[in-house]
């Protein structure tokens, strides 16, 4: 508990340091068009939070990006399991996964703009950009499963279901957590980028684009802070779900 409090305090002081530095630099520049001050950004965020379309934009973007992320999780697990059990599938998927990891995000967004409606653009881009990370992490976790545990399960004739739950899932959860957190950051970056380029009505990307057109730097910073907060909440929810799975497996 004391260690957690110290960590929280250190992180809090670090955040305060950067906010103060931001305020000092903004004060020195003294041009809101170039760099908005933290106080101006906070005021804009509070004002925006009481507007109806603010929450509509938040829910629209959050739902689409997180939907894409969880679709990527499901698809990545299925493909990783297939690759683990069938070498031919692993060989077949290798060039595809390697290619996806190398393709620039902007190229992916433009390609999907040609293929699909802008409303679903952030979902598809999030899936496409995060799938390789999830797939590689889960596959590595499966390949690192302790062979001695599998032999022991075979000797004691442990059922396939128990083997999956208590050996495979428990072993791959740490890989799923680390890969998932990395993928989540990519999902938000690529998803918002897709919205800025595609400009779907009622999205965060739309208001970011408008802020750029009208040179509204305060609003731009305000929405950037909102995106950071949404990403932070997403990470906490994901980690909680992983820990919940661990507790269920351990019977706590």
Identify the role of each PLM range.
Residues 67-97:
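Transmembrane-helix boundary motif in ABC transporter permease subunits
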Residues 124, 128, 161-194:
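Transmembrane alpha-helices
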